[in-house]
Amino acid sequence: MTFLVLANFKSHKLEAEVTTWLSAVAPALAQSPRLKLLVAPSLLHLPASHTYLSTHPIPIDLVAQDVSPFPPGAYTGAINASQLKEYGVTYSLVGHSERRRYFHETHQDVANKVNELLSCGITPAICLSREDIVPQFAALSDDQQNKCIYCFEPPADIGGTTTAPLDVIKDTVAQIKNYTTAPVLYGGSVTPENVASLLTLPIDGVLVATASLDASSLTAIISTCSHAR
């Protein structure tokens, strides 16, 4: 199975910095045929990223950081799935802990976003804490569950240098895989220094945020993942 590395820029970087970053990681991808890099820039930078990747042969999939739970219509300020599709988006994060915490998104909100994404052929990347697993899967139909990818991200372990304990990650990933055959990633303080230990676990990829902002740091993670898998 192809190992996934998902880089989430959150609200970092300006447009020129994004394209410079894309160029900088390209050589590492040429040496990593069994790995797929997914990149989630700011929604504002998806058009420029799409244009850049359309003219440069870099094997990177574009990811949206969020999507409207509504179809096209009178929803001021919302960006719907069909609009994301127009700019080459193939995946979209949904249910990130920061969206659940700061924007009070519910499990049903996430399920509505999943429905919109799947209707446009975009793969949802559903972020889950341990506490989200049961209610989030309950909000999804059986058909939807296997058409997504999943990211276990314990909120307490985001933005630091230490991951969740490996036994906790292993147990939680197993819980998620009881519901689905889809890929399951781990996210939460993934760094070049600790990613090798994560590769001993039955995960299908990693979600990288802070450590992805520096191209050399992300390149080191790609290299480790590529040689270990």
Question: Where do the protein language model's features map onto the residues?
Answer:
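Glycine/small-residue-rich loop that forms an oxyanion/phosphate-binding "nest" at active or ligand-binding sites
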Residues: 54-114
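C-terminal helical cap(s) of enzyme catalytic domains, especially alpha/beta-barrels
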Residues: 113-117, 211-229
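Glycine-rich phosphate-binding active-site loops on the catalytic face of alpha/beta enzymes
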Residues: 93-102, 154-161, 202-221
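Conserved N-terminal beta1-alpha1 strand-loop-helix module at the mouth
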Residues: 1-76, 139-147, 157
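Glycine-rich beta-to-alpha transition loops that act as phosphate-gripper elements at the mouths
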Residues: 66-67, 74-75, 108, 128-130, ...
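Catalytic cores of alpha/beta
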Residues: 131-139, 190-204
